[in-house]
A protein has these predicted regions:
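N-terminal "cap/leader" segments of large eukaryotic alpha-helical scaffolds
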Residues: 1-29
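Amphipathic alpha-helical scaffolding segments comprising HEAT/armadillo-like alpha-solenoid repeats
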Residues: 2-13, 35-49, 68-82, 103-117, ...
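Secondary-structure boundary/capping motif
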Residues: 9-13, 56-57, 75-76, 89-91, ...
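Short coil turns that connect the paired helices of HEAT/ARM alpha-solenoid repeats
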Residues: 14-20, 48-54, 81-87, 118-125, ...
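Structural detector for internal amphipathic alpha-helices that build alpha-solenoid repeat scaffolds
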Residues: 19-36, 46, 57-69, 87-104, ...
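A sequence-level detector of short, solvent-exposed, charge-rich linear segments
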Residues: 63, 78-79, 96, 111, ...
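Acidic, small-residue rich beta-repeat scaffolds with periodic aromatic anchors
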Residues: 123, 132-134, 141-155
Length: 155
């Protein structure tokens, strides 16, 4: 293996065992995604549970790219449903859509999107995002969409 890549993998693995300032965590997470360091086996679930929203946001990129030892789907669903930061919840919706389509986890993600789209306490834009991604999962060709409160409708 290329020594430079090995060094990047070791830096990424430190995300599992060391505490770093938020900026350092974000930089290392970006490296994992940019270099597609799947060999590093980063514990995405641990990063998704971080107290700082910036780390959770960066970790959602790992879910999207599928580069962690843990896939982060369950933790991302938890963020989608309950994170105190509404913007992070919206990011989780996109990451879940990208990570789950065509995988065995798609059923879990569909159910989470259904729950969010029907949750009166969820912000309108989050309900709309959940409906949109649910529609995209249902009709990946883009020929049909899900309309608010009406179910699948033709374009």
């Amino acid at each position: 293996m290329d020594p430079d890549r090995q060094k990047l993998i070791e830096r990424a693995r430190e995300l599992n065992t060391s505490e770093f300032p938020v900026i350092e965590l974000q930089e290392r997470i970006r490296e994992v995604c940019f270099e597609y360091l799947i060999e590093a086996k980063v514990d995405v679930d641990h990063l998704l549970g971080h107290e700082d929203w910036r780390v959770r946001s960066s970790a959602l990129d790992m879910v999207w790219w599928g580069v962690g030892a843990t896939d982060g789907i369950a933790a991302s669903i938890e963020i989608l449903m309950h994170d105190p930061d509404e913007d992070i919840r919206a990011e989780a919706a996109l990451a879940l859509y990208e990570a789950a389509r065509g995988t065995p986890k798609e059923t879990q993600v569909r159910e989470a999107f259904r729950r969010v789209s029907a949750a009166a306490e969820a912000p309108e834009y989050l309900r709309a995002a959940a409906l949109t991604y649910l529609g995209k999962l249902d009709h990946p060709s883009g020929q049909r969409r899900v309309g608010p409160g009406v179910g699948p409708v033709s374009e």
